[in-house]
Amino acid sequence: MLRKCVGCGKIEDREKFVKITRDAHSNVFVNPNSKIFGRSVYLCYNKSCVEAAFKKNKIQKALKAPIPDELKGKLLNEF
């Protein structure tokens, strides 16, 4: 299935992205194996896409929920 990166707009197969999900209780987390359902966004596995998505609040807008600071730090340090 094709998905779009919220950082750069690149369209690829969903296995090439990291998935960030908001569940029914407004908890936001990285969902690597797609086992949890909810509103989701996808990011490329590179630091520039992560930075672009956070700079313009694209993740927060797409998930309609605030992003925890520890998740921001985790994603920025991971790439």
Please identify what each model-predicted range represents.
Residues 2-5, 41, 46:
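Residues immediately within or flanking Cys/His clusters that coordinate Zn2+
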Residues 13-31:
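Short recognition patches in nucleic-acid-associated and regulatory proteins
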Residues 9, 45-50:
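Cys/His-coordinated zinc-binding microdomains
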Residues 34-36:
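Conserved catalytic network of the ASCE P-loop NTPase/AAA+ motor domain
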Residues 51-79:
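C-terminal structural segments of small proteins and small subunits
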Residues 13-16, 49, 54:
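Short functional micro-motifs and their immediate structural scaffolds
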Residues 1, 6-9, 77:
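Catalytic cores of RNA-modifying enzymes
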